[in-house]
Swiss-Prot record:
Segments for region (J segment): 121-136
Miscellaneous section: This sequence was derived from a T-helper clone.
Lineage: Eukaryota, Metazoa, Chordata, Craniata, Vertebrata
Region (D segment): 117-120
Keyword Disulfide bond: yes
Protein name: T-cell receptor beta chain V region LB2
Length: 136
């Protein structure tokens, strides 16, 4: 592999912000998370789009996105298809936290935060770069 390509790929992997064409940013922290079985783990998401609705999704290898929680505004939490084993918190319009209440042994997954805006009859979701969780 060319050293410039390697440097570019490395830089992309270390970036925790996803910038979208209209200048908005979704930041997920941490980028990588290693935990132990039974541990409570918290993931954070910030957006500066001024979007009302935010989401947390889980994506396991070989599977599509599964909705964990979403929030239409501050202090409003709606359970998704996969909310068992998770808690969420949204005290400000710009931030949405997700807590894995009890990490499962050998769990390896990616969590994705998104925010959305509805224009006319279409809704566009803007995604963060993801948090990769590994449980030992």
């Amino acid at each position: 592999m060319n050293k410039w390509v390697f440097c570019w790929v490395t830089l992309c992997l270390l970036t925790v912000e996803t910038t979208h064409g209209d200048g908005g940013i979704i930041t997920q922290t941490p980028k990588f998370l290693i935990g132990q079985e039974g541990q409570k783990l918290t993931l954070k998401c910030q957006q500066n789009f001024n979007h009302d609705t935010m989401y947390w999704y889980r994506q396991d290898s070989g599977k599509g996105l599964r909705l964990i929680y979403y929030s239409i505004t501050e202090n409003d939490l709606q359970k998704g298809d996969l909310s068992e084993g998770y808690d969420a918190s949204r005290e400000k319009k710009s931030s949405f936290s997700l807590t894995v209440t009890s990490a499962q042994k050998n769990e390896m997954t990616v969590f994705l935060c998104a925010s959305s805006i509805r224009l006319a009859s279409a809704e566009t979701l803007y995604f963060g770069s993801g948090t990769r969780l590994t449980v030992l």
